[in-house]
Curated annotation (Swiss-Prot):
Coiled coil: none annotated. It comes from Phasmahyla jandaia (Jandaia leaf frog). Belongs to the frog skin active peptide (FSAP) family. Phylloseptin subfamily. This is Phylloseptin-J4. It comes from the Eukaryota. Has antimicrobial activity. It is found in: Secreted.
Length: 19
């Protein structure tokens, strides 16, 4: 689960940057 957190943060960051 801890290994999935950075991936989720990276995805959210990418979405925020795209907006």
């Amino acid at each position: 689960f801890l290994s999935l957190i950075p991936h989720a943060i990276n995805a959210i960051s990418a979405i925020a940057h795209h907006l």
